[in-house]
Curated annotation (Swiss-Prot):
PROSITE patterns assigned: RECA_1 (PS00321), RECA_2 (PS50162), RECA_3 (PS50163)
Protein family membership: Belongs to the RecA family.
Entry binding sites for ATP: G69, P70, E71, S72, S73, G74, K75, T76
Gene Ontology BP term (one): SOS response
Protein name: Protein RecA
Origin organism lineage: Bacteria, Bacillati, Cyanobacteriota, Cyanophyceae, Oscillatoriophycideae
GO molecular function term, any single one: single-stranded DNA binding
Source organism (scientific name): Trichodesmium erythraeum (strain IMS101)
Function field: Can catalyze the hydrolysis of ATP in the presence of single-stranded DNA, the ATP-dependent uptake of single-stranded DNA by duplex DNA, and the ATP-dependent hybridization of homologous single-stranded DNAs. It interacts with LexA causing its activation and leading to its autocatalytic cleavage.
Gene label: recA
Length: 360
């Protein structure tokens, strides 16, 4: 065992080296973990209560986040909702539109304050990532969305001829940029969201042939990776009015990973938060469902999920009351699984059965 004298000498040496490090690199360059003022990671709401639950509270601040999936699966919608939630809490948001496809009308419909949203439409991948770096270093921006990694075309590729080969250029660009900006992201508390597309690996016989663009660097640097898929198209008669999306938390460094959340995305309106509330209210027994009928405190208020959503949208006070009770249940540690929210197709089957019985 070390003697008391040895321990004093060690402590003296430790204090000396800590002072030297702080003097050289600045105060806060090294701290004891127990002395940290912010042990809990702050979060931004994703706009979907079910996804917030799966993420352990929401999208973490001061981290790199990747959202990937097939085309028209809801990637940009999810990012715009995160921007809207940031702006609601008084934050400043920026959108780096590398795809040159941002629709201001749709963004406004989702609740984004387009008058104060910072937008950049860069010509090259280098320019886009330099813009992100400057915004992060400013410590004035709370969230930056890059749409998308696949559209971050290196300058050499743009200036070259159409048939030229540029093997690994984009991957090297992403790797260099992430090495440069990740440290600043943590210090500034700015959340950087990269949207990404899927590609197919050639010659894969066993395992998943899908991969994301931009190399492997983003997979390592991202604290959260969300895999979003369209599982169902929502229809009224023959008219399509939205999609049912399923998000798998493929990676999470701030909460348990591999959770799954489901929610509706309505065309022109975005994520149906009321739908999320109904699903979680049913799980926490705030609302009961028998067959297709939904009831609250013993009284039926709607038949079928669509009518229940319509009822709550037209009765805002009732919806807020249900949401408050759901959040209270969740804060008290209610056993709710993000993997088992109500499935639209299952409910519709129940509704069809009930309607058939009524006709008989």
């Amino acid at each position: 065992m070390a003697s008391a004298t040895d321990n004093k000498e060690k402590q003296k040496a430790l204090d000396s080296v800590l002072k030297t490090i702080e003097k050289t690199f600045g105060k806060g360059s090294i701290v004891r973990l127990g002395d940290a003022t912010r042990m809990k990671v702050e979060t931004i709401s994703s706009g979907a209560l079910t996804l917030d639950l799966a993420l352990g509270g929401g999208l973490p601040k001061g981290r790199v986040i990747e959202i990937y999936g097939p085309e028209s699966s809801g990637k940009t919608t999810l990012a715009l909702h995160a921007i809207a939630e940031t702006q609601k809490s008084g934050g400043i948001a920026a959108f780096v539109d590398a795809e040159h496809a941002l629709d201001p009308t749709y963004a406004a419909a989702l609740g984004v304050d387009i008058e104060n949203l910072l937008v950049s439409q860069p010509d090259t991948g280098e320019m886009a990532l330099e813009v992100v770096d400057h915004l992060v270093r400013s410590v004035a921006v709370d969230i930056v969305v890059v749409d998308s990694v696949a559209a971050l075309v290196p300058r050499a590729e743009i200036e070259g001829d159409m048939g030229d080969s540029h093997m690994g250029l984009q991957a090297r660009l992403m790797s260099q940029a992430l090495r440069k900006i990740t440290g600043n992201i943590g210090k500034s508390g700015c959340t950087v969201v990269f949207l990404n597309q899927l590609r197919q690996k050639i010659g894969v016989v066993y395992g998943n042939p899908e991969t994301t663009t931009g190399g492997n660097a983003l997979k390592f640097y991202a604290s959260v990776r969300l895999d979003i898929r369209r599982t169902q198209t929502l229809k009224k008669s023959s008219e399509e009015y939205g999609i049912h999306a399923k998000v798998k938390v493929a990676k999470n460094k701030v909460a348990p990973p591999f959770r799954v959340a489901e929610f509706d995305i309505i065309f022109g309106k975005g994520i149906s938060n009321v739908g999320c509330i109904i699903d979680l209210a049913e799980e926490t027994d705030v609302i009961k469902r028998k067959g297709a009928w939904y009831s609250y405190q013993g009284s039926n208020f709607a038949q079928g999920r669509e009518k229940a959503i319509a009822y709550m949208e037209s009765n805002i006070d009732f919806a807020k009351k249900i949401e408050k009770q759901v959040r209270d249940h969740l804060s008290q540690g209610a056993l709710v699984s993000a993997n088992s929210v109500a499935r639209v197709d299952e409910i519709e089957e129940d509704e069809d059965e009930d309607e058939a019985l009524e006709e008989e």
